[in-house]
A protein has these predicted regions:
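Active-site histidine-acidic residue metal-binding/catalytic motifs
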Residues: 1-61
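Active-site microenvironments of hydrolase-like enzyme catalytic domains
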Residues: 3-15, 52-119, 148-164
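Soluble non-cytosolic domains of exported or imported proteins
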Residues: 18-26, 52-56, 116-124, 172-180
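Active-site-adjacent mobile loop/cap segments within catalytic or ligand-binding domains
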Residues: 18-21, 72, 76, 134-192
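Sec-exported extracytoplasmic/periplasmic mature domains
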Residues: 29-40, 63-67, 75, 130, ...
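Catalytic cores of nucleophile-dependent amide-cleaving enzymes
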Residues: 114-136
Length: 192
């Protein structure tokens, strides 16, 4: 499942000519196509153009549909021509979040603890993205940062392994060069 930043009511950050909402939707559609072609998975976007998204709607959608993986995409404007890729995962307190937990499928889990169930898989997936994007081939095309564990609102309440990728670009079409590296960085999906 891919969550492009923004919606009908929230245009997101200002880019060179447009806004984050439109660029992330296009970016998400290309990544969706790349993942489907390369790994044969059914990839769902959390919103369509013109749709307004309520708080925690994406978390509810991902949990009800039992998504195998959740990716939140974000784009911001930067001055440097070399794109930056930053990976985040949800983490409130490393001592508590990363501790071993036993889960009963019949127990209510609060939204701020939903990520506990798959935190080790999430961290592993984020580190996989790091190892692929720090590869010599892709290192020339982009600067990679992370993965960083922090409270990140788009990932709150999601049980499935989930990461966010934020991309810094200097021109609105620079994201097109990043589709291949990101699809390659998500190569762990072929084993899901």
């Amino acid at each position: 499942m891919i969550n492009p930043a923004g919606d009908a009511k929230n245009v997101g950050r200002k880019l060179v000519e447009g806004f984050e909402r439109g660029v992330t939707l296009q970016f998400s559609e290309e990544i969706q196509k790349g993942l489907t072609d390369k790994y044969g998975h059914r990839v769902v976007l959390t919103r369509s153009p013109g749709e307004a998204v309520l708080p925690l709607q994406n978390a509810s959608y991902a949990n009800r549909s039992k998504a195998d993986f959740f990716l939140s995409l974000h784009v911001y404007r930067q001055e440097e021509p070399k794109p930056k890729v930053i990976v985040y995962h949800l983490l409130y307190n490393p001592m508590v979040d990363l501790a071993q937990n036993n889960f009963n499928s019949f127990t209510f889990v609060p939204i701020h603890q939903a990520h506990f169930q798959n935190i080790s898989r999430t961290v592993g997936f984020a580190n996989n993205v790091k190892s692929v994007l720090n590869n010599g081939e892709f290192k020339k095309k982009l600067d990679f940062y992370g993965p960083y564990g922090l409270p990140f609102k788009p990932l709150v309440g999601i049980v499935a392994p989930s990461i966010a990728i934020e991309v810094g670009i200097c021109e609105d079409n620079n994201w097109k060069h990043l589709v291949e590296p990101i699809v390659e960085g998500l190569n762990f999906l072929e084993n899901l």
